Structure formats: C-alpha cells, structure tokens
Amino acid sequence: MAYESLASEPNDGVTDHNDDALYVGIDTLKAARDNIKGWYLYSFSSEPFVVSAVATYVPLLLEQFARINGVQLDDHNAPCSTSSSDKCVLGLFNNRVFVDSSSFALYVFSLSVLFQTVVVISVSGMVDRWKTISFRKNVLVTFGMVGAFATVLISLLNETQYYSLVVYYIVANSCYGVINVVGNSLLPLFVDDLVRLQPDHTVPAAEELSLDTDDKDGLTTVISGRGASIGYSAALVVQLMSILLVRLSPSKQDIQYAVFFVGLWWAVWQFPMYWLLSDSIIPDQQSNQAIANGRYYDIDGSIFTFVNLSSLKYGWKLLGEALKHATLLRDVVIFLIGWFILSDSLTTINSTAIIFAKTELHMSTINLISLSIITMISAMVGAFAIPQIVSTSLHVPPQRTILLIICWASIIPLYGMLGFIFQSFGLKHQFEMFILGVWYGISMGSVAAVSRSLFTIIIPKGRESTFFSLFSITDKGSSIVGPFIIGIVTDKTHNIRYSFFILFILLVFSLPIFKMLNVERGKREAEEISKLHVNIDPIQD
C-alpha cells in the first residue's frame, strides 16, 4: 500500500501544466466534472432519508409500535387499544420501566442523535487523515449501503419488534450522519480540482452565473446550492411516491411501504455515484513532487485499511483543537451557545409536532405525509425569500434577521399553548396544523440560510473547516437534549401539549444570547486569530 501526497495546495486555482507527474494517463478534466455530478448524486440519494424517514416516518412507526405493544396507563394488565385517544405506556427492560408511547419516540430520537454524534466525530478524523477521493467515496458508499439496508430492514419488521426498530433506526441515522459530513468535506476538493484542471478558467457552472473560477467561494456556493436543490427535489419525489404507496397498502395507512421505498432509493443511487467519483489528480509514485501537504493518497482506497484506534482518536483531537480556537473568540462562543438552543428548539418542534398531530389531532398517515411535503416546500421558499427580502431588499443585518426569525418561530409553541385556554383554536383542528406547517417551514429554511452566513462573518479566514465542524456538531448534537426533555415532560403529564411550554421557553431564552452578539467585534477578533499559525500535524498520533 503506497501513500503519496500533492506538493502543495492549489495556488489561486492556477494549474502548473509543467508538473506532468500529477497526471497518470486519465482524462483528469472529465474526472473532475464527473466528481461534481457524483456529488450531486450524494445529495440526491441521501436527502430523502432525513426529510422523509427521520422527520416523519420513523417517529410515527415508533409511536405506533409502542402503542401496539403497550398497556393502558391506568391498568397495566390491560393491553393498549389501537385507538389514539387512549393513554398508553410501554414496558421496557422486562417491564422495569414504563414510558409514554409518545415519549418512546422522543427518547429514541435523542439516543440516535447521541450515537450519531459519537460515530461522526470518530469517523471524520479517519477521513481527515486520508483525503483521497477514492477513500472518501468508499466511506460514502459503505455507510450509504449500510444505512439503506438498515432502513429496508425497518420496513420488514413486524409490530412486536420494537427493540429491533430502535437498533435499525440508530444504525441508519448514524450512517446518514457520517455520509453527510464526508459528502460536505468532498465539495472543496472537487472545486479545487475543477478549477486547477480547467486551463482556460471556463468552468461551466461559473460561466452560467458570470463567476470567475478564481472566485472559489462563489463557485462553491453555486455548486452547493444546486446540490441542496437536487436533494430537496429528490425528497419531494420520494414523498409523493410515498403517498401513492401508502394508499396502495392493504390498510391504506401502512407507512412501512414508504420506509421501504426510502431505503431502496438510498441504495440504488449509490451505484452511479460510485462509478462517477474518482481521484482526478493522482501523483506518480516515483515523482519528486510527492511531498506531504495533507492530501494522502491510497490507490486502493479501502475503508477497512484505516479503521484503527489512532484514526478514530484523531477526530476527537480535531474537536479539541476546534474548541481551543473557539474559546479565543468571544462572539463565536456566544453564537454557538445561542445556536445550540435555537437549533435544538426548532428540531424538537418537528419531532414533537408530528407525534402531536397523530395522537392528539388523529391525523391520517396520508395527511401527515402531505403536511411534511408542505413544510418542506415552505422551507425551500423561506431559505430563498427571507435572505433576499429581509437582508438584501430591507438591508436588515444578519444578527437582527435571526432575532426576527426566532420571534417568528416562537409563535408556533405559543399558539399550541393557547389550546389550554381555548376550546375552538390553539391546535384543536387538523387544518391549523397545515397552517403552522407553512409557518414552521419558513422558519427552518430561513434560519438555515441566515445562521450560516452570520457564522461565516465571525470566524477566521482559512479555518472555516475547523469552525464549521463545531457548527455542525452543535447543530446535530443539540438534538440530544430537547427530545429527551420533552420525553420526560410527556412521561410525567401524559399530555404532549405541555411540551409547547418548554419549546417556547427555549426559543425565548435564545433571544438575549443572540442579542449579546457583536458582529463587528467578532470580525475584528477573527482577523486577529487568522494571523496565528496554529495547526495539527495530520499524521501525528
């Protein structure tokens, strides 16, 4: 096994055409363009899992399995009725612990995110040490196939296998977390290769939008935006197909048919992605240019070659380095604390609302999938319209924009709380759920767009990867806390409506934290820290 590396990072997107050692008889430009297409397929194949399965299908299945295997709250000797109006609890660990059927789904979601976070940090270190496209491709496909297989297995379970449902869901969600991080890490490499291999600086994606290929940030944004659009389009297709499959099921409510389709979709699109992704630049093993710069080349790209304790520990070393850098920047710390609370609140609203709609409003499976589609479309509109209207047209700075979005989002739990006072409104009817679905979608789409742009302003240039790893971990890891707290509240009250109080408090609590953010001070501190030459040797143990 030979490990080689490129001489240096690309110099302003200019290729040294005299460096023939970099080219080993392959159509490098075609390979670079194919990599972009393969990256689009990564989003196209996996996005339906998180949009459809994680957000809608699996929470419904968890609540359904818990209810079918549960007992009545008032009489643990009486089996739970399939009617959604009964209060049911599920006995766990040989009936040593009883949890509300709604809480069960929330606890499992929290547990899955915990496992996902640990796996992602560990695997990301391994990927950062061996940066070949071939190796990362194998990581993508391996975890993609395992995740897809686990998703298909969920669809084959019978209703008594609730422990198996938990295990398969944790495996699938952890696999998605890995491919999400690895997929995002590939984009900068693809853009670098595309720019340096294009001799006349006419990259098609840049031409169409009047971007110079020297503007790597602009080109990256264009390709990233297209990938996100392709992913959402795939999720929309899967959701529409899921409605048809559920309608064709014997009970016309069997959501496992939809889960099977999600797993099948995820698996099938791995094959063209595998064929498209490859190393567009591979150094000659005899070349004097094979000098370490961090891009290590394993020609075989086997994932199993690098699974060792040293590689797994490296991810945690990188996390420690990122935390050390973050503590030097006051406004980055303020942002991450606020983002932890805000992201947790918004994510928990989704998982809570889907269970609330099923158990309290008795919405059918078809209506719940339709609600998910409406929310997704609204998120796409929010991601595009809010930054354009509020930030560009009205010239509202990002910090104030995110405060407005928090106020907008807090209306959702506040409206749910009104149900304790009024009998005619306050999430008492199904149509109200569709209205709030639009409201929530706009919140999610806009906050995703604005938060990233705001964070970009206050982090040091040249260390974006380090700080965005913290952003990602904060974003994903925060989802451990909210569902767990809501699960406890629902267990104590056996009324999931009380969760709206917790969600409202969390959203309001994030307001003064973001208010403390000083963007100008953050920019100054970021410029100062960017002058420091702090780094980790990627091959040190």
UniProtKB/Swiss-Prot annotation:
Q: Which domain of life is it from?
A: Eukaryota
Indicate where this protein resides in the cell: Vacuole membrane
Enumerate the CDD domains for this protein: MFS_Atg22_like
Which regions span the lipid bilayer? 41-61, 103-123, 139-159, 163-183, 228-248, 257-277, 332-352, 366-386, 402-422, 431-451, 470-490, 499-519
Q: Name one GO biological process term.
A: autophagy
The cellular component terms of Gene Ontology attached to this UniProt record, alphabetical and capped at eight, are: fungal-type vacuole membrane
- Which Pfam family is one of this chain's hits? ATG22
Entries under InterPro entries matching the protein: Atg22, Atg22-like, ATG22/LtaA_families, MFS_trans_sf
Q: Which residues are glycosylated?
A: N308
Q: Where is the signal peptide?
A: none
Q: List the membrane topology term(s).
A: Multi-pass membrane protein
Q: Which UniProt keywords apply?
A: Amino-acid transport, Autophagy, Glycoprotein, Membrane, Transmembrane, Transmembrane helix, Transport, Vacuole
**UniProt entry tagged with the keyword Nucleus:** no
Instruction: Describe the task this protein carries out.
Output: Vacuolar effluxer which mediate the efflux of amino acids resulting from autophagic degradation. The release of autophagic amino acids allows the maintenance of protein synthesis and viability during nitrogen starvation.
Give the family from UniProt.
Answer: Belongs to the ATG22 family.
Checking PANTHER family in the record gives: AUTOPHAGY-RELATED PROTEIN 22
Name of this protein: Autophagy-related protein 22
